[in-house]
């Protein structure tokens, strides 16, 4: 049995154990006397066994084969030896804990807190991205990728680093060491590249908002994120695993864990440090500097880009004549025109919303000064079979901008409906070039007045009574008419009122409004399917049994005139509606002969002469003047518009669902409430109202500038904090990486300093969720939902406010 035991020991132990048994085998192995003595106590040769034993030759050959095989075995780079040879310089017994027990407890507690905060913060970022649809944007895709990298650092890298730092040595062996280093450097480098991608994304979004955002798709974002992880995967893990085989041996001791080529090859060290840190941080600094410079430039140029400057190439609501309609004491049409460069300073972009700048809404009146109206907006874009006229470059650009602006609006379905209608169905409500309605403003039909040489007869002084426009489709471009001045507008209003009175009081049944059951309606009055008269001071009325004469029965020249509407001659007015008594008389005039309807219309016309025909509607409630009382009453009692299927349906092509719920009319113009109130005071109070207007304007301008400065300052501070935190946490370690290969002294840099700077890089993963996510209000609200376990609830109020404001 003893030879068998010796053979087993020889297979698993050092070859020196066999020396007491067979002195002839000890040719290549030497041991000390102490070792042989302790070994021979358990392996003593029995009696009768001697070096001349017959079995000695066989055993000698066997053991020589075993020892030669072990000596010529494959090289193991992780053990640093061939076969079962041992290296006395590498072992776990050489090092122990470097810190006291109290220090180890404190370090473990701090490391556990940092790791938990890092993991929790990045998990909240990923959950927020998942449960809130508002956060699923292109920019937040980059944040999601960054959160994945930081989560890996907090879950894997930080705990293992804390273990090796507290114990003072690496206890898990070389294979786990290389795996930990590969994952650690992969996640850290991916985190840096994700920061770089975010920097590029913000830079292009600021400097190239139009071209870049068109290419900024989810697929491109996925490609960029994949590139960040792919570069990190190629840069670190392959070299960490393969470097001991490249050099032929592993120089890292078993009780330590670091990348071998950082100490053995200074060229690789410099290259990886430049590629992993110095190049990205340099690019990030440059990009953020450009972003900061562009922000400052825009902040400096902001007064020139505001709506106060007249720039028709960028604004669709600019017109050739900017007038503000106010209430005058006894005038038919009173316009308070603000002169100088301050007349547009109250205008605000559509994207801005402020509680200090509320709005009032006013309808639009279109005036054709005796010429063929200019072609409409859609015909200038879609009509290809018509004769082209020569237009100015400014006019063409203006037309294109208007069509482009309306192409993405919510009422684009109205345009499709208008295309279905024939172009010769008459008039439709024209779309003006004023500021489009916000999405929260309901569309209602408006009354639009047009003056031209319409009919061959039945007019006074060559001017026909104003009509309701039923179509703005004009397939034939016509010359641009001259603009109607304010004096012409006032003269037109006076002539219109007198014409309406004369025509309607004739009593012969041939006027614009006729109560005869056999009379036909020529389009000069408003036809209500319910038989109620909704007239105004400009001669609007109805008959109970009147029939609508389609414009196709008119002469061709008149239809051509009727289809064209001038978009430049646009003035904002409100058509006065009749009182309840007048409406009742007009509705009941069918049985009283021609004189009854004429008298009712005449009374409406006279009422329009006595009261102001232009009135500003304030959003905070009805006006308190006595003249405006009938207007408010009529607007409150106005009946719903006829449907498309009724006998007197009008091809307005507008959504009628909001007409009976909102008294604000179609194509309303949005102006600040301060200007409306101050403008009314200026018309009635003279210099005092003008001073009030200027004070309100200056106060709003100062407050807006202060808000913009605060926003720009906050954005600049956020960008600076992000860049500063990255530089502070990553620079010290990367400086040591470049310094250590250059120094011949291995102990010049203390181990504690290495560990501290290495841990500082991890802290950047803890700061990233705070810098990127907590600066976003939507992230903060989602964090609160997660912490309060409200996973499936939504902030409806915030969503509605974000969509409709």
From Swiss-Prot:
Q: Where is this region: Disordered?
A: 27-47, 302-322, 340-359, 507-530
Question: Where does the record say this protein resides?
Answer: Cell membrane; Postsynaptic cell membrane
InterPro entries from the entry?
GPCR_Rhodpsn, GPCR_Rhodpsn_7TM, Musac_Ach_rcpt
Q: GO cellular component annotations, sorted alphabetically?
A: dendrite; membrane; plasma membrane; postsynaptic membrane; synapse
Q: Which residues lie on this side of the membrane: Cytoplasmic?
A: 122-141, 199-220, 288-718, 774-805
**Role noted for this protein:** The muscarinic acetylcholine receptor mediates various cellular responses, including inhibition of adenylate cyclase, breakdown of phosphoinositides and modulation of potassium channels through the action of G proteins. Primary transducing effect is Pi turnover. May have a role in the processing of olfactory and mechanosensory signals; regulation of neurosecretion.
Q: Which GO terms describe its molecular function?
A: G protein-coupled acetylcholine receptor activity; G protein-coupled amine receptor activity
PROSITE patterns attached to this UniProt entry = G_PROTEIN_RECEP_F1_1, G_PROTEIN_RECEP_F1_2
Listed CDD domains: 7tmA_mAChR_DM1-like (cd15301)
- Give the originating organism: Drosophila melanogaster
Q: What is this protein called?
A: Muscarinic acetylcholine receptor DM1
GO terms for biological process, alphabetical: adenylate cyclase-inhibiting G protein-coupled acetylcholine receptor signaling pathway; chemical synaptic transmission; G protein-coupled acetylcholine receptor signaling pathway; G protein-coupled receptor signaling pathway, coupled to cyclic nucleotide second messenger; phospholipase C-activating G protein-coupled receptor signaling pathway
Leader sequence segment: none
Its keywords, alphabetically, are: Cell membrane, G-protein coupled receptor, Glycoprotein, Membrane, Phosphoprotein, Postsynaptic cell membrane, Receptor, Synapse, Transducer, Transmembrane, Transmembrane helix
Please list the residue ranges that the record marks as compositionally biased, kind Low complexity. Answer: 27-43, 507-525
Residue ranges under compositional bias (Basic and acidic residues)? 308-318, 341-353
Q: Membrane topology type, per the record?
A: Multi-pass membrane protein
Please state which protein family the record places this protein in. Belongs to the G-protein coupled receptor 1 family. Muscarinic acetylcholine receptor subfamily.
Source organism superkingdom: Eukaryota
Gene3D superfamilies associated with the record? Rhodopsin 7-helix transmembrane proteins (1.20.1070.10)
- Provide the transmembrane region boundaries: 101-121, 142-162, 178-198, 221-241, 267-287, 719-739, 753-773
Carbohydrate-modified residues: 65, 84, 87
Provide the free-text tissue specificity comment from this protein's UniProt record: Intense staining in the glomeruli of the antennal lobes, the region of the nervous system containing terminals of antennal olfactory sensory neurons and mechanosensory neurons. Also a discrete group of neurosecretory cells in the pars intercerebralis of the brain.
